[in-house]
């Protein structure tokens, strides 16, 4: 999958996240099924919007998502948000 970049981000930020957003994910993301390449819908400096399609595959009970997985997803979102604000 190719990544064209987010129009609200400076070129150096789009360059930093291009591999990640093209689906070339690190092992931890692949193992946990965290897909920023599919779920990150918008990004601008200091802001990202993720839409996670909760299909129940991360549930520990009916309608209850495993908290550790939510923590990992949240960490990923916050990290990506931080990257949008880094200087060149």
Language-model segments: what does each one mean?
Residues 1-88:
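Terminal targeting signals and extreme-terminal segments of soluble enzymes
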